[in-house]
């Protein structure tokens, strides 16, 4: 089970967080914690006319937390900040295997594929969703 949970695609996604340097021109910041396991995510973004033009994530936690943060970085690029709450809800529903007819704001759910092993482990969903939960918590710097 652990082998499939920490498969190569998921670990590659997690590595994105470590490869992207801190933003020098960040305009907003959000911090969230998972009190159950101690994971912590700090997301900084640069916004121009409500569009996320750059982001960086500092994730202190498990590989699943880092993978979710890496996915957040991929999905947030050049997207309105308001879309991120919708994507948070969509990813949460996908993890829970709740089928929706509507496709979420111009993405293919194939982007979630590296996280497929996590679907079966409900108590790890919050780890994956932690970076996405920053969507409504950003404050100007």
Name the predicted role of every residue range:
Residues 1-20, 82-141:
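C-terminal binding/interaction regions
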Residues 16, 20-55, 59:
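Structured beta-strand/loop patches that form or line metal/cofactor-binding pockets in enzymes
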Residues 25-28, 37, 41, 57, ...:
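Short capping/connector residues at structural and topological boundaries
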Residues 53, 76-86:
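Phosphate-handling active-site elements
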Residues 61-68:
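Short, thiol/selenol-centered motifs that function as redox-active sites or metal-ligating centers
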Residues 68-78:
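Alpha-helical support elements that line or immediately flank enzyme active sites
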